[in-house]
Amino acid sequence: MLVFVDNEHIDAYAKSWGEKIMAARVRIKYRLEDLTGDHCLIVRYNQVTPALLNQLEAKAIFISGSSANPDEYDPADLIGLHTAVTSKQWPVFGFCGGFEVLAEAFGIAVAPIGPLAADETDHNPNFAPGMKKEFGYLPIKLTKSHPLLAGLGDAPIMRQAHSWEAKAVPKDFENYGETAVSHHQIFIHNTHPIIGTQFHPEYYTDEHPSGRTLIHNFCQQAGLIKQ
């Protein structure tokens, strides 16, 4: 069984977009099941512990994004999830907010990219108004090769929706991607199947299929695809 951690803040589901978020989580769950041929269980972030993952016989952990900023979470609610991912007991893939969870779990500060300059136009004023951000399907410059990045070319198009970023690379990880706005886009652990992306590969489309390729590569190398 795969575990897909719903990293959405518990207050978000009471908001007007709560049902859309849940629908998106279910769609991603089905995509992971279709890619691997295995079952996938959605578990809320504040319920994850190593004991639960062992009880579920989890084969891997996928961590969703979130509409909330990282500083809105109670650190106590993330202890179990942080303990699980840093134990290196399971393959882990963090998407956007999940990437930021990984960064924090491994000791790296996460903070806003920064405010727009006075002469900069805010092209997406309904998303993090006044802040530097990335939003939409945009190219990611790959800075070095890795088996997980096979088939992506030099600048795959991925879905972006973030105004926060990891401010450094965690120990035992390397960064494999960058953009002009945010230099840390892909963290891959040097010895364990742990990856995080600041973007959303799980929102791949027929027009922009690179996210599917990346997730498939991870699932294949982690031994998650049933033959």
List PLM regions with ranges.
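Amide-donor transfer/coupling interface in amidating biosynthetic enzymes
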Residues: 2-31, 38-39, 45, 84-87, ...
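Flexible gly/pro-rich beta->alpha loop and the following alpha-helix that scaffold active-site loops
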Residues: 30-94, 106
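Catalytic nucleophile loop
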Residues: 99
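Structured adenosyl-cofactor binding patch, chiefly the S-adenosyl-L-methionine
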Residues: 102-103
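Post-Walker A helix-loop "phosphate-sensing" segment adjacent to the P-loop in P-loop NTPases
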Residues: 107-113
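Glycine-rich beta-alpha loop elements in corrinoid/cobalamin-binding modules
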Residues: 115-117
